[in-house]
Curated annotation (Swiss-Prot):
Keywords: Cytoplasm, DNA-binding
NCBIfam families named among the record's database cross-references: DNA_YbaB_EbfC
Domain of life assignment: Bacteria
Subunit text: Homodimer.
Protein known as: Nucleoid-associated protein SG0690
Function: Binds to DNA and alters its conformation. May be involved in regulation of gene expression, nucleoid organization and DNA protection.
Record organism: Sodalis glossinidius (strain morsitans)
Protein backbone atom coordinates (compact mmCIF):
# COMPACT_ATOMS: atom_id res chain seq x y z
CA UNK A 1 0.00 0.00 0.00
CA UNK A 2 2.74 2.48 0.94
CA UNK A 3 5.59 0.84 -0.95
CA UNK A 4 9.10 0.22 0.28
CA UNK A 5 9.66 2.29 3.42
CA UNK A 6 6.55 4.26 2.56
CA UNK A 7 4.94 4.41 5.98
CA UNK A 8 8.19 5.42 7.67
CA UNK A 9 8.82 8.08 5.04
CA UNK A 10 5.25 9.33 5.36
CA UNK A 11 5.61 9.67 9.13
CA UNK A 12 8.95 11.44 8.73
CA UNK A 13 7.42 13.85 6.21
CA UNK A 14 4.48 14.50 8.52
CA UNK A 15 6.83 15.32 11.42
CA UNK A 16 8.96 17.61 9.23
CA UNK A 17 5.86 19.38 7.95
CA UNK A 18 4.56 19.83 11.49
CA UNK A 19 7.88 21.40 12.54
CA UNK A 20 7.89 23.68 9.49
CA UNK A 21 4.29 24.72 10.14
CA UNK A 22 5.11 25.53 13.76
CA UNK A 23 8.04 27.73 12.70
CA UNK A 24 5.92 29.37 10.00
CA UNK A 25 3.09 30.12 12.45
CA UNK A 26 5.59 31.75 14.81
CA UNK A 27 6.99 33.78 11.92
CA UNK A 28 3.52 34.81 10.78
CA UNK A 29 2.59 35.95 14.30
CA UNK A 30 5.53 38.39 14.14
CA UNK A 31 4.52 39.83 10.76
CA UNK A 32 2.94 43.25 10.54
CA UNK A 33 0.88 44.46 7.61
CA UNK A 34 -0.81 47.79 6.99
CA UNK A 35 -4.22 48.16 5.41
CA UNK A 36 -5.39 51.44 3.92
CA UNK A 37 -8.60 53.19 2.99
CA UNK A 38 -9.54 56.59 1.67
CA UNK A 39 -6.53 56.61 -0.67
CA UNK A 40 -4.17 56.19 2.27
CA UNK A 41 -5.81 58.75 4.55
CA UNK A 42 -6.51 56.02 7.10
CA UNK A 43 -4.02 53.24 7.83
CA UNK A 44 -4.36 50.32 10.23
CA UNK A 45 -1.42 48.06 11.06
CA UNK A 46 -2.07 44.59 12.47
CA UNK A 47 0.15 41.64 13.28
CA UNK A 48 -0.21 38.02 12.23
CA UNK A 49 -2.42 37.31 15.24
CA UNK A 50 -4.82 40.00 13.95
CA UNK A 51 -4.04 42.31 16.86
CA UNK A 52 -4.26 45.97 15.96
CA UNK A 53 -0.84 47.58 16.45
CA UNK A 54 -1.40 51.09 15.10
CA UNK A 55 -4.10 53.35 13.63
CA UNK A 56 -3.07 56.40 11.61
CA UNK A 57 -5.60 59.05 10.58
CA UNK A 58 -4.73 61.96 8.34
CA UNK A 59 -5.46 65.19 10.27
CA UNK A 60 -7.68 66.47 7.45
CA UNK A 61 -10.23 63.76 8.31
CA UNK A 62 -10.62 64.89 11.90
CA UNK A 63 -12.78 67.80 10.79
CA UNK A 64 -15.05 65.63 8.63
CA UNK A 65 -18.04 63.45 9.34
CA UNK A 66 -17.51 61.06 12.28
CA UNK A 67 -19.47 58.26 10.56
CA UNK A 68 -17.28 58.50 7.48
CA UNK A 69 -14.12 58.32 9.60
CA UNK A 70 -15.43 55.25 11.42
CA UNK A 71 -16.21 53.58 8.07
CA UNK A 72 -12.72 54.36 6.79
CA UNK A 73 -11.11 52.89 9.91
CA UNK A 74 -13.19 49.72 9.57
CA UNK A 75 -12.31 49.46 5.87
CA UNK A 76 -8.60 49.90 6.60
CA UNK A 77 -8.74 47.19 9.27
CA UNK A 78 -10.54 44.83 6.90
CA UNK A 79 -7.92 45.53 4.22
CA UNK A 80 -5.14 44.70 6.69
CA UNK A 81 -6.91 41.49 7.77
CA UNK A 82 -7.27 40.44 4.13
CA UNK A 83 -3.59 41.12 3.50
CA UNK A 84 -2.44 39.10 6.51
CA UNK A 85 -4.72 36.21 5.50
CA UNK A 86 -3.20 36.20 2.00
CA UNK A 87 0.31 36.24 3.46
CA UNK A 88 -0.54 33.37 5.80
CA UNK A 89 -1.96 31.31 2.95
CA UNK A 90 1.12 31.90 0.77
CA UNK A 91 3.58 31.05 3.54
CA UNK A 92 1.73 27.93 4.62
CA UNK A 93 1.43 26.74 1.01
CA UNK A 94 5.21 27.02 0.76
CA UNK A 95 5.51 24.67 3.74
CA UNK A 96 3.45 21.95 2.07
CA UNK A 97 5.07 22.22 -1.35
CA UNK A 98 7.32 19.28 -2.03
CA UNK A 99 5.26 17.04 0.20
CA UNK A 100 4.00 13.92 -1.49
CA UNK A 101 0.42 14.22 -0.33
CA UNK A 102 -2.41 12.06 -1.63
CA UNK A 103 -4.51 13.61 -4.43
CA UNK A 104 -7.28 15.81 -3.07
CA UNK A 105 -5.69 16.11 0.39
CA UNK A 106 -6.67 19.45 1.93
CA UNK A 107 -4.35 21.21 4.33
CA UNK A 108 -5.94 22.88 7.40
CA UNK A 109 -5.14 26.44 6.25
Amino acid sequence: MFGKGGMGNLMKQAQQMQEKMQRMQEEIAQLEVTGESGAGLVKVTINGAHNCRRVEVDPSLLEDDKDMLEDLIAAAFNDAARRIAETQKEKMAAVSSGMQLPPGFKMPF
